[in-house]
Amino acid sequence: MRWISHTMISASLCAVWQPALMPAAVLGATAPDWLEWLGRRHLPLAHAVHRGRTHNLLAWLLLLVLGWAGQPNTLALAAFALGGVLHWFCDALTVTGAPLTWWSQHRSTLFGGRLRQGGKTERALAWGVMLCCAAL
């Protein structure tokens, strides 16, 4: 999915839960991509593939549990991790899929991975989530 779809979906869902934490959720929703970008330029991940180590579900779920367990002091961390989890789910809806763990190169898809990046279905999903959340 494109960054705007990740942003719309995470911001909308976080607005229903904790509106004040929307910036953390948006930062988390875009984190797999900007962490990968930073890693390719400044860390020893120069040969990292897209949707690799920064895109695995297990790491984001562990971070979410840590953020949730320490509440109320760590709710921003939970929102950040929620954004990362939502990023994974959105990417898993696409044809390319996303990895469950950092040690596996297998990419999982949800519902057959039918979405194409930037396509009409992706935009419809992002707008649909946003409108449903706005209605709540």
Task: Show where each model-derived region lies.
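N-terminal membrane-targeting hydrophobic helices
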Residues: M1-L136
